[in-house]
Design a protein with these regions (language model features):
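"A position-specific structural signal for the A-helix of alpha-solenoid helical repeats
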Residues: 195-203, 229-239
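Amphipathic alpha-helical repeat scaffolds of TPR domains
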Residues: 81-166, 189-203
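Inward-facing hydrophobic residues that define packing positions of alpha-helical scaffold repeats
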Residues: 127, 180, 214-215
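N-terminal cysteine/histidine-rich coordination modules
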Residues: 1-85
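Alpha-helical solenoid scaffolds that mediate protein-protein interactions
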Residues: 183, 216-220, 224
Length: 244
């Protein structure tokens, strides 16, 4: 069962406006979804980023680690009628319920009405985030570009009825190859990214390079399994995204 925390209020680093977000408390996994060669699995939440979203106030990308955490909201809005308030005043409000209600009522309306952070999940979301801040740190740029790669590949993923998960515009098609080449630059020399590197080379049609990279993957109990499967695709000169 997927469950979320009570709302957490943050201040946007760009406009100082407020937004709310929820963290995952527990997550439901579907056992019958495919695992794809680009590293994205079929879980509904797989491509969404929990590290960055779109501020509902100024509509710019906001990284959670840059946003100031203001407060945690209660899961349910504190409310109390007149008789309840009188009772708690007379009895000393021993459990603090009246204090909680009064503190809530004293909060600015704008804070209480803060809208949710808009999560990035579509290709255009990640393109916009990269365009807004072209001087991202390598780690942040990689985070966005990998998810853009996944989102652009969604046109090749299919649901249970054989329908493509997403369409792709001309602009998105034109950016797909440069995006993959840039990811290759960003992961150059990273031993942990060898499977990703091999898959990118395969999708770019550089099959011999892909095979060489995948054969050199260091076993860790999982990576080598993916590497062997992707290597077979590269050896067969198959460049398209494939379920593993």
């Amino acid at each position: 069962m997927t469950r979320y925390s009570a709302p957490i209020i943050h201040q946007c680093p760009a406009c100082a406006g407020h937004f709310k977000r929820h963290t995952l408390v527990s997550m439901h996994f579907h056992a019958d979804v495919p695992d794809w060669s680009d590293g994205k699995n079929g879980q509904w939440w797989a491509s969404a980023s929990v590290s960055v979203g779109r501020c509902p106030v100024c509509s710019t990308s906001a990284w959670i680690e840059d946003a100031v955490e203001v407060m945690h909201f209660p899961r349910h809005t504190p409310m109390m009628g007149g008789l309840g308030r009188l009772w708690h005043r007379m009895t000393g409000d021993r459990n603090g319920r009246l204090r909680t209600v009064l503190e809530w009522e004293a909060l600015p309306v704008a804070l209480k009405n803060a809208e949710s952070l808009g999560w990035l999940s579509e290709a255009d979301d990640f393109i916009a985030a990269l365009t807004e801040a072209p001087q991202q740190s390598p780690e942040r740029e990689l985070h966005l570009r990998v998810r853009l790669w996944w989102a652009l590949n969604d046109r090749l993923r299919h649901d249970g009825g054989g329908t493509p998960s997403a369409s792709q515009s001309l602009m998105q098609r034109s950016i797909a190859r440069p995006n993959m080449l840039r990811i290759l630059e960003l992961i150059e020399g990273s031993p942990k990214a060898q499977v990703t590197r091999g898959e990118l080379l395969r999708q770019l049609g550089r099959f011999d390079e892909a095979v060489a990279v995948l054969k050199a993957v260091i076993p860790d109990g999982r990576s080598e399994v993916r590497a062997v499967r992707i290597e077979r695709l590269a050896s067969a000169r198959i460049a398209a995204l494939q379920p593993l």
